[in-house]
Amino acid sequence: INSFAPVGTPVVLCAKGLVSDPHKGGLFLPEYARPHLKGRPLAMLTGPSFADEVLRDLPTALLAASDTATLSAQIAAQFSASSLRLYQGSDMIGAALGGAVKNVIAIAAGICAGQGLGDNARAGLITRGLAETARLASQLGAESHTISGLAGMGDLVLSCSGPHSRNMAFGFALGSGKPVPKSLAEGRFSASILKARSKYEYVELPICFAVDDIVNGDVDIHTRISALLSRQAGQE
């Protein structure tokens, strides 16, 4: 990017995930990008959106987040359309975290559906997944309203809503014993990095850890589900 974007050129991050890091275990995209893109204002464009629905001009709401209020306002103005609403925010870490964690939780939701555990279980899983997201966000200094907004809850609900979600489809295949889809499931690669970062931060993410054990650790699904369900339930 530095070769094509002169210093002072805004860079908008649209990807969702983490980058492995030898010190912290993993970095969220703004953390990784800042030292590599010095002198270039950063922003994130994120939220609950399936690309094909955006292309079909179906109503969509996204978040433009930047440390610089003028940049988030500029992005919102440039990309807004009759069917595309862009809200503005300043919490880039919260926006990046929500987009990364939801991919892992969506795999768990898919496994839940593939195992035939029911709608009650899926609702509980999504809610507790949001709680895990909020715990890590608090540790990293993110804003709680970001996690309860489009980049957090909004993206999580969409990604856990059905097979249209690549990560949920991947989890469903695992849970039902069917061939794993060849399409990219970002959560598959994010799970281990997220686990490493959360351990660095001393934050426990039971659902995310379970997904990593199943996807990358070759742990039996039934064994891991039983372990999750046997955990003591504390204060919500």
Show where each model-derived region lies.
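Internal alpha-helical scaffold of NAD(P)-dependent oxidoreductase catalytic cores
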Residues: F4, Y32-L42, P59-T146
